[in-house]
């Protein structure tokens, strides 16, 4: 009798995606982050669902409802901190996943890559709106500053900002709509993830060499399911340690003060995972110029397939490109650090140099290095 997992209409889809999926035999732990992102998404949806049962999206009661969750709801504190720190783990996995894609040339799969970039934008939007919901000082002022950036758009900017706010300032209407979008977006992300996987399984996975491996494939289960379970256990261990020992390590102390429109915090900054983009925004002393640098800092990923000048797909055999890639990796924590510092000397000039380096590496130096490596004498 034929196995039910190969004949049942629903089981067949799961089987072809996670059990009998032909997978390259040489993919490393860098390929674990896709499944870890899936786990993070499920965790965020589940914890978010329980938080939404007790949260009220009203400016008068939002802050106290979060306090109520932490103090009065059974295990509410652990659900709240799992959700807050789960977002940090989500972005760590996301950055690792994108970094692996850049290093091994996964962006050659155009459809998969472009859906991935859309997923990144959707996740960033969700995280930003989620940061506004506790209605602390940094929630309120972060929402005010970031949404205000749209006013830099000529002619329609001011109207656009007021339309997003639902009034003349960040208020009840803003909080309500942000809660609505924050609730619905993860489900849209889940749907886009399915499309991402669909396109990936059309072509099959890339591998560290970047060379087609159709003649050397193994089934996904049990080889990579075991590997993914190990990755998942490590992720859960790190998240649990973070939640139980230092739950506020990655948060901002200002967010424990209720939002006050009459009192501006000394230094307004978003969550740590947006600081690299925030540093690029601040490095240009002009509102429109800053916005025009901020958007391409992430949208630049769309250009990666066009920027690929190498004859080889992966950087595995390209020492010059590897050096430049790791300089880029070092540049990002520097931008993140600068984004969290006040706007004063020497942070301004360091931020400007790091921002120039970021764009120079991706747009000029890495494509040039690939061209040079193409023309190196063959031994």
UniProtKB/Swiss-Prot annotation:
A Pfam family this chain is assigned to: Cytochrom_B_C
Binding site for heme b b566: 97, 196
Principal location listed in the UniProt entry: mitochondrion
InterPro entries from the UniProt entry: Cyt_b/b6_C, Cyt_b/b6_C_sf, Cyt_b/b6_N, Cytb/b6-like_sf, Cytochrome_b, Cytochrome_b_C_euk/bac, Cytochrome_b_N_euk/bac, Di-haem_cyt_TM
PROSITE patterns given in the database record: CYTB_CTER, CYTB_NTER
Record's subcellular location: Mitochondrion inner membrane
Alphabetic keyword roster: Electron transport, Heme, Iron, Membrane, Metal-binding, Mitochondrion, Mitochondrion inner membrane, Respiratory chain, Transmembrane, Transmembrane helix, Transport, Ubiquinone
Membrane topology recorded in Swiss-Prot or TrEMBL: Multi-pass membrane protein
Cofactor note: Binds 2 heme b groups non-covalently.
Top-level taxon: Eukaryota
PANTHER family named among the record's database cross-references: CYTOCHROME B
Function comment: Component of the ubiquinol-cytochrome c reductase complex (complex III or cytochrome b-c1 complex) that is part of the mitochondrial respiratory chain. The b-c1 complex mediates electron transfer from ubiquinol to cytochrome c. Contributes to the generation of a proton gradient across the mitochondrial membrane that is then used for ATP synthesis.
Name of this protein: Cytochrome b
């Amino acid at each position: 009798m034929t196995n039910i997992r190969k004949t049942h209409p629903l089981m067949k889809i799961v089987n072809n995606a996670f059990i009998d999926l032909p997978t390259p035999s040489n993919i490393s732990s860098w390929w674990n982050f896709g499944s870890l992102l899936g786990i993070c998404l499920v965790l965020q949806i589940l914890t978010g669902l329980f938080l939404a049962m007790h949260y009220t999206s009203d400016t008068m009661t939002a802050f106290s409802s979060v306090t109520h969750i932490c103090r009065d709801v059974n295990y509410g504190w652990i659900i709240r901190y799992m959700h807050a720190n789960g977002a940090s783990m989500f972005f760590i996995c996301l950055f690792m996943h994108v970094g692996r894609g850049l290093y091994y040339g996964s962006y050659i799969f155009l459809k998969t890559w472009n859906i991935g970039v859309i997923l990144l934008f959707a996740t960033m939007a969700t995280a930003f709106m989620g940061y506004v919901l506790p209605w602390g000082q940094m929630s309120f002022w972060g929402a005010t500053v970031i949404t205000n950036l749209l006013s830099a758009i000529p002619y329609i900017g001011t109207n656009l900002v007021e339309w997003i706010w639902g009034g003349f300032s960040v208020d009840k209407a803003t909080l309500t709509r942000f809660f609505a979008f924050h609730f619905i977006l993860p489900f849209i992300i889940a749907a886009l993830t399915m499309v991402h996987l669909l396109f990936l399984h059309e072509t099959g996975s890339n591998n560290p060499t970047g060379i087609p491996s159709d003649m050397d494939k193994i089934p996904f289960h049990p080889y990579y399911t075991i590997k993914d379970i190990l990755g998942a256990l490590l992720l859960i261990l790190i998240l649990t340690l973070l939640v139980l020992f230092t739950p506020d390590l990655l948060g901002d102390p200002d967010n424990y003060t209720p939002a006050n429109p009459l009192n501006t915090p000394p230094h307004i900054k978003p969550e740590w995972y947006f600081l690299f983009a925030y540093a690029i925004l601040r490095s240009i002393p002009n509102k429109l110029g800053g916005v025009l640098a901020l958007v391409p800092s992430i949208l630049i990923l769309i250009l990666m397939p066009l920027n690929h000048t190498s004859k080889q797909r992966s950087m595995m055999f390209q020492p010059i490109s590897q050096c430049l890639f790791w300089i880029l990796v070092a540049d990002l924590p520097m931008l993140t650090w600068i984004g969290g510092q006040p706007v004063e000397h020497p942070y301004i000039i360091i931020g400007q140099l790091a921002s120039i380096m970021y764009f120079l590496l991706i747009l000029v130096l890495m494509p040039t290095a690939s061209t040079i490596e193409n023309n190196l004498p063959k031994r």
